[in-house]
Amino acid sequence: RVYEVYKILNKDFDLIINLQGDLPIFKKDLLEKTTKLFSDDSVDIGSAVCDLEDSEINDNNVVKARVVLDDQDEGFALDFMRTVDCTKNIYHHIGVYIYKPNVLKEFVSLLQSKREKERNLEQMRAMDNHYKIKLVKVGHNPPSVDTIEDLKKIRLHFKKNNF
């Protein structure tokens, strides 16, 4: 869908941001930090992670990323999964993706990979086709709407904040 909009707009962009629809609230530093990942020319796709809460370890609705972070809290993704055996170098993956336009164009033309189908995780298609996904750790986890209860919480937040 993001690529379809990009084609319709018919404009040149340095980067294309895909913010997942289940993240209705986020802080601007999420996009600022993720965009800055592209100062490294080897990055194909940028995304973000945050600390994994104990309650999320066994939650299959929470996508996890394995990454070794450097002193700038950045690193290239090693894997994405819904279930984990150990929590070393495992973080909560946040559903924001920033693409170089040529990478997005190539990505949408690729067939689903075996691991993408098995895990129901689109980013595995990129990993399996050797795209470099760089992650940055942010200090907050934007609320995600995955269940009816989540939706109720977000609606209450909007109501309290006059949205």
For every predicted segment, state its role.
Residues 1-21, 25-36:
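Short phosphate-binding loop-to-helix
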Residues 8-11, 60, 155:
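One-carbon transfer enzymes
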Residues 11-13, 40-44, 131:
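Short, high-confidence coil segments that cap the C-terminus of an alpha-helix
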Residues 16-19, 46-48, 107, 134-138:
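Short beta-strands and strand-loop turn motifs
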Residues 26-113:
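Conserved core of the sugar-phosphate nucleotidyltransferase
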Residues 90-163:
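Conserved alpha/beta core of the MobA/IspD/sugar-nucleotide pyrophosphorylase nucleotidyltransferase superfamily
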